Regions:
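Conserved AMP-binding/adenylation subdomain of ANL enzymes
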Residues: 203-221, 231-273, 288-293, 352
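AMP-binding/adenylate-forming catalytic core of the ANL superfamily
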Residues: 268, 275, 421, 426-427, ...
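N-lobe entry segment of adenylate-forming
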Residues: 1-51, 55-70, 74, 98, ...
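ANL superfamily adenylate-forming
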Residues: 45, 109, 113-114, 118-124, ...
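Conserved AMP-binding/adenylate-forming
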Residues: 303-305, 312-337, 341-457, 465-467
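Conserved pre-ATP/AMP-binding loop-to-beta segment of ANL
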Residues: 36, 165-184, 190-191, 201, ...
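Conserved C-terminal "lid"/linker of ANL adenylate-forming enzymes
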Residues: 494-499, 510-511, 531-584
Length: 584
């Protein structure tokens, strides 16, 4: 691979095309005629690789010929450990030219040690029926362990693959209905599912993002620290830049977590205009900034600061813009959006160049009657909650909010969000029953998300599977978690709420909180205070458990996993009961 020794330019030598291609390889064929590409930075902010789209195309075609030389066929699955590295891009697009289906596998992230990660990888390899698995040298030992005794044609890195013979065959023709890739869900409520996305679906979504969501300009430049195995990182920050012939700069996810201010430094130095993050990324940056440091950065060119992938709290964006005021950051850069892997990526975008809009509602009314009622002067402060508007759906989509009987609901009535459009998945790989549960025969996708419409815009309030149902009331776990996070001792993201079975076959709510204090009196006081405030503000009894720091589980993409937290809690209760029985 021939890498450039300086970043690829922002301005290009070929006319801009807004992702209007029939396939990813057609898009790369066009992007390769220009000068732009992908750039990779170390945790110290130093450029270590620049891969122009022309070089990427050349490398990808060579890889495709070697994949075909292994005896693989069009449609075979190729598992790729998705490290933020140029090798991953070469392998991913090599699969595209070979007509094979790349499957991005997560790198180590919030899993309980080596053995858990190996087991997780093996489960994904078996689930997708991978024919080969490739990774960087750093992950080869783990990959070999995870793939032991599996019927694979190849296990290794790019260097090993490059030494393989070239097939003396023509590259296959890629058609719109061919599978482009399999994207695993984050697994926030269950084991990750392999979402099957066709060339037609992903190209439709890329076009909508480029034309309607971001309204890309020739002067734009992307920067990302999001992992390649996450749909926002892969589709939004790998495929969108390539399909729009736009340069992109990458910082590895783990380096961002260690040095979040490097994100701001690179935004300042590269002149990037577009970057996306879940809300926790903005929160993490704020937590590492000391007074006066904002002026060290020039964020005046940051045109779009996208935010999505998890619930958006208005206070987080307000604090970030206030903290970064001296950097030239404009609050109007914030762009809330909504999407999911099952829809390729994007479903809706808020309007550009407007301040984020918040709908302040009475959460008691949602719990009791399922309607998002605006607050008034008599609404108690404890019942006030703000939800960000996530914009109008992209033009390709039909969107409905449906009630429990499948009826279509009117504005401000809360229900399950259903979408239909060309970007929607073909189904879950090797899971016909789950596909039938989620995708109707006439193309409607049950997102599993709860929300309502307001002035034509989507408002997301949570996940259906996360709902806590107490005495017929639907209670959002985020409302309970918010009570905890208002306490001075508890950081944002250090509390998870869920329901567990009660002895009378009903449900009871549980709040698990990470808390480093060991003093017994302080711990007791915090538990009692939380229980009392939850009872006062939400009207339910809640069992509060305090656990050590770094106990709460997350998905591979960093989202909180309430389902895993629930299972861990039940396991702790079981172990405690067994220990009590042994003592007795």
């Amino acid at each position: 691979m021939v890498l450039l020794n300086k970043p690829t330019p922002t301005l290009n030598s070929v006319p801009f095309r807004a992702a209007n291609f029939s396939s990813l390889i057609e898009a790369l064929d066009y992007a390769a005629q220009g000068d732009t590409g992908a750039n990779f930075y170390s945790g110290k902010g130093e450029l270590y690789a620049a891969l122009g789209y022309a070089q990427l195309r050349e490398e990808a075609i060579a890889i495709a010929q070697r994949l075909l030389g292994l005896g693989l066929e069009k449609g075979d699955r190729v598992a790729l450990v998705a490290e933020t590295h140029p090798d991953f891009l070469s392998l991913f697009f090599g699969c595209q030219y070979a007509g094979m289906v790349p499957v991005a596998l997560p790198i180590v992230a919030n899993l309980s040690g080596h053995s858990a990660y190996v087991e997780h990888l093996r489960g994904l390899l078996e689930n997708c029926d991978a024919k080969i698995v490739a990774s960087s040298p750093d992950f080869l030992t783990i990959v070999e362990e995870a793939s032991r005794n599996l019927d694979l044609r190849f296990t290794g890195d790019l260097a090993k693959l490059s030494a393989m013979p070239v097939a003396d065959v023509e590259l296959p023709t890629i058609k719109p209905d061919d599978v482009a890739y399999i994207q695993y869900t984050s697994g926030s409520t269950c084991f990750p599912r392999g979402v099957v996305i066709t060339q037609r679906s992903v190209m439709s979504n890329l076009g909508g993002i480029v034309r309607d969501g971001l309204k890309l300009r020739e002067s734009d430049r992307f920067l990302s620290w999001l992992p390649f195995y996450h749909d926002m990182g892969m589709v939004g920050l790998v495929l969108v830049p390539m399909a729009s012939q736009t340069s992109v700069d990458y910082l590895e996810t783990r380096e961002f977590v260690k040095r979040p201010r490097m994100w701001l430094r690179l935004m300042s130095e590269t002149g990037a205009t577009i970057s996306f993050s879940p809300a926790f990324g903005y929160q993490l940056c704020m937590s590492r900034l000391r007074p006066g440091q904002a002026a060290e950065y020039d964020l005046s060119r940051w045109r779009i600061a996208g935010v999505g992938a998890e619930m958006i709290r208005p206070v987080t964006l307000e604090r970030f813009s206030r903290t970064l005021k001296d950097s030239g950051f404009n609050k109007k850069a914030f762009l809330s959006c909504y999407g999911m892997a099952e829809a390729s990526l994007a479903i809706s975008f808020a309007p550009l160049d407007e301040r984020p809009r918040t709908d302040w509602i009475d959460i008691e009314q949602i719990a009791r009657c399922g309607k998002a009622m605006p607050i008034n002067n008599s609404t108690p402060e404890s019942r006030v909650k703000g939800f960000m508007l996530c914009g109008k759906p992209l033009p390709e989509y039909d969107v409905e909010i449906r009630g429990e009987q499948g009826e279509v609901l009117q504005e401000r009535h809360c229900g399950v969000i259903y979408v239909r459009g060309q970007s929607v998945m073909s189904g879950y790989y090797n899971a016909p029953d789950k596909t039938a549960e989620t995708l109707s025969s006439d193309g409607w996708l049950d997102t599993g998300d709860l929300g309502y419409m307001l002035d034509g815009q989507l408002v997301i309030i949570g996940r259906k599977k996360d709902l806590i149902i107490i005495n017929g009331r639907n209670i959002s776990p985020q409302d309970i978690e918010y009570v905890a996070e208002k306490q001075p001792e508890i950081r944002l993201g250090d509390a998870l709420a869920f329901a567990v079975p009660a002895s009378d076959d009903s449900e009871t709510s549980v709040l698990v909180v990470e808390y480093r204090e060991t003093d017994t009196e302080k711990r007791t006081e915090l538990r009692e205070r939380l229980s009392m405030q939850i009872r006062q503000e939400i009207g339910v009894d809640c069992f509060v458990e305090l656990v050590p720091i770094n106990t709460l589980p997350s998905t591979s993409s960093g989202k909180p996993s309430r389902s895993k937290a629930r299972l861990q809690f039940l396991e702790r209760i079981k172990d405690h009961e067994e220990a009590q029985g042994a003592v007795a």
